[in-house]
Amino acid sequence: MGLWNGKGTGGFILYLLVAFSVAVFSVSYVGDTTNPIHHHLSSLSATEKIWPDLKFSWKLVLATVIAFLGSACGTVGGVGGGGIFVPMLTLILGFDTKSAAAISKCMIMGASASSVWYNVRVRHPTKEVPILDYDLALLFQPMLLLGITVGVSLSVVFPYWLITVLIIILFVGTSSRSFFKGIEMWKEETLLKNEMAQQRANMVNSRGELLIDTEYEPLYPREEKSELEIIRSNLKWKGLLILVTVWLTFLLIQIVKNEIKVCSTIYWILFIVQFPVALAVFGFEASKLYTANKKRLNSGNTECICEATIEWTPLSLIFCGLCGLIGGIVGGLLGSGGGFVLGPLLLEIGVIPQVASATATFVMMFSSSLSVVEFYLLKRFPIPYAMYLISVSILAGFWGQSFIRKLVAILRRASIIVFVLSGVICASALTMGVIGIEKSIKMIHNHEFMGFLGFCSSQ
């Protein structure tokens, strides 16, 4: 039940801390050997918008196929797919990096929105509760939104090679962790299926067979419900209202901040205001979970407070808040929705794959749409291309959820979702890694500045 109940989690966190620390501290050495003036001149040309025309070609066909598969697999795993979209948009279609990140957010928004619409029409696989965990959404969403704003700011300060290294470190770690989690689940499912087969053989035509089948049935409804009844049961208006309010608050701050001179006093005030807003909502939900968990322990109740199976102690709550913040920062640096951290984290705290996928895409819908509105106001992406790729992502997100649910129902192995999640993160690590290394090598050959940049001077 505890978050630190195994060596795996502690070892994974230690790996991230050591690797991140080495990478960040190495900037001071690398930065001393390069020329900041040369970098400033080259960065000016790198910021030029490159928007290819939307016309039929083999590149568009290939990009459409990759976008469809990336969106389908990304929503199934609850990670979005930004690590696949950005390289596809830059290498195949020829967009500049900033425009690619903006269009990537549009695609994630479309895929996650269609995925959420599909999921609200699906019942929870084992309980009579919403498949979207609103408690976890309220816990992670404000920190994720805060992290995205911080990540966007850090993307201006951090050198490109450092962002590449940090992303590879994180993606390799989360992908490996998720893969081993999937193997564990696969073994457990195999044991359960073998036990069921053995008990069926011993209890043919008996009442016990029905009881066993009912106990294992995580994928079929216990009683018939209409689609409207399922939608109503999956929508909690109070939780939705809070989530939308937080989203609107951050959106308003971003809109006002974009109209103000960078690094002015008002700019920094608005930037700092985001912290108490996010921490207030996070603190409200954290105290709610902590109090409920304490009452549960005092009463001797063994039922979990929400979908997570961990004990909601101050340490675990702080850990989840930091992970949400890190997920947002990664989303801001990479141009993804933050699901590369949130998806694996939900599995780590004991959320079953179906609910983890649904909840992660639900939270990503808010984070990605916030960025899309901001990018639209900044005119960061061409509308025709964005609308086309959003349409592809919407179809892919819906199809991906439908296909994987049927596959899981047939095979009775929810671990498939975990393997898809791991595969998408691994593919993202490879594509982002190759592109990042190639670009970093070019920067070294051109003797460009490889250290930290000034935030105000780089705007």
Swiss-Prot record:
Matches recorded under InterPro entries: TM_pro_TauE-like (IPR002781)
Keyword vocabulary terms for this entry: Membrane, Transmembrane, Transmembrane helix, Transport
GO cellular component, one term: membrane
Pfam families per the UniProt record, alphabetical: TauE
Transmembrane segments: 10-30, 50-70, 75-95, 99-120, 131-151, 152-172, 240-260, 266-286, 315-335, 338-358, 381-401, 416-436
Membrane topology: Multi-pass membrane protein
Location of this chain's protein in the cell: Membrane
Main location, first listed in the record: membrane
Family recorded in the similarity comment: Belongs to the 4-toluene sulfonate uptake permease (TSUP) (TC 2.A.102) family.
The protein, known as: Sulfite exporter TauE/SafE family protein 4
